[in-house]
Swiss-Prot record:
Quaternary structure, from the entry: Interacts with GDNF ligand and RET: forms a 2:2:2 ternary complex composed of GDNF ligand, GFRA1 and RET receptor. Interacts with SORL1, either alone or in complex with GDNF. Interaction between SORL1 and GFRA1 leads to GFRA1 internalization, but not degradation.
A Gene Ontology biological process term: glial cell-derived neurotrophic factor receptor signaling pathway
Gene: Gfra1
GO CC list: axon; external side of plasma membrane; extracellular space; Golgi apparatus; multivesicular body; neuronal cell body; plasma membrane; plasma membrane protein complex
Membrane topology: Lipid-anchor; GPI-anchor
Entry's family note: Belongs to the GDNFR family.
Stated name of the protein: GDNF family receptor alpha-1
Sequence repeats, residue ranges: 25-113, 150-238, 239-342
Keyword Repeat: yes
Residue pairs linked by disulfide bridges in the UniProt entry: C36-C42, C154-C214, C161-C167, C178-C192, C187-C233, C216-C221, C243-C313, C250-C256, C267-C285, C277-C337, C315-C325
Glycosylation sites: N59, N347, N406
Region forming the signal peptide: 1-24
Annotated propeptide span(s): 431-468
InterPro entries given in the database record: GDNF/GAS1, GDNF_alpha, GDNF_rcpt, GDNF_rcpt_A1, Glial_neurotroph_fac_rcpt_a1/2
Amino acid sequence: MFLATLYFALPLLDLLMSAEVSGGDRLDCVKASDQCLKEQSCSTKYRTLRQCVAGKETNFSLTSGLEAKDECRSAMEALKQKSLYNCRCKRGMKKEKNCLRIYWSMYQSLQGNDLLEDSPYEPVNSRLSDIFRAVPFISDVFQQVEHISKGNNCLDAAKACNLDDTCKKYRSAYITPCTTSMSNEVCNRRKCHKALRQFFDKVPAKHSYGMLFCSCRDIACTERRRQTIVPVCSYEERERPNCLSLQDSCKTNYICRSRLADFFTNCQPESRSVSNCLKENYADCLLAYSGLIGTVMTPNYVDSSSLSVAPWCDCSNSGNDLEDCLKFLNFFKDNTCLKNAIQAFGNGSDVTMWQPAPPVQTTTATTTTAFRVKNKPLGPAGSENEIPTHVLPPCANLQAQKLKSNVSGSTHLCLSDSDFGKDGLAGASSHITTKSMAAPPSCSLSSLPVLMLTALAALLSVSLAETS
């Protein structure tokens, strides 16, 4: 009985363990596509799916539409068993655009595209604390500089960039095209955008974030921060387009569409979490935000008195789509997750220093709570932009405070939904709806080996009892 138990149980346990390992192995879409094209069955279904996407863009005929959709669904179901279905891309990778093209050929919904799409990028799961450990703090770097500015962190960050060869190289590379006028245009916007993308993709976050998310106490500092991306070229235009029109334009470009989806995925606010971020990860939110810079959806600070950001667009001429337009715009302007992430970077703190909040109850429903705008008076102009230093430790250091004092600390130092009213549009809807075909959630098998071991132990006990 004992040997029979081992004979059947061990192969099953080995199978589960191998499944757990392979589940974590995810190919990038370029490699997954190459692998698929080498298999006859996969290659046939993949070509069918690509024709489906092309057919959707040119509109199916009314007579063949239903048959075509059934064939498309059949192809998608077959590909769910292949590595291509679960592939992702990496930001800044060598063949990023090609990788993203393959990804969207898999996940572009046949029913249409909506605001919130799953990110095509492999999760980074980095932390602000990782960035802080990468290089010395800016204040330490500036001990090497004779004339240090007093209180202008953004100026200090620019000087720190000049001390780093990589940062200096890529900063100069975008300053030139972004400030050089040509014919009747202010600059070469296309070259400016490309150089900005390279800057934020190639330069260490400690330096690029130091310039983009520097904490400020006065207008001179905040204005320098606002000017970081040379907005007169990269951001502003003669006219403001409608935000939904800008979104449609963004979705015609693989890079822009992907960066926008990444932003909505990683900066999703959640009022019930301690950090006000659904994913409780500030670094991933800042990475996603910076990824938008250099696309047609380039965001920037709306003024020099707050942390509110927005793309260069408004909701005029929205007609019946006004509510959807406001949802889109307010996701940028009143995003508590992003604002807390910017403040945490300025503080030199991180969300990992908190006591983990109880898991937010989420479902697979197609509606995700984005934000709730409430009218509540703020302090003096610019106060929300200032990093609180009169209370120690600020925001993300609350858990350390709890451990020292052995009392439950309050989390009210972080921004919450109720703290915004100054820049918000009152009455905006609090939900963003998605109907797009998102990638399937990865199934965790980590608990199965434990269950199998438990079952195996029970079988062994029974076997030993019978033999005795």
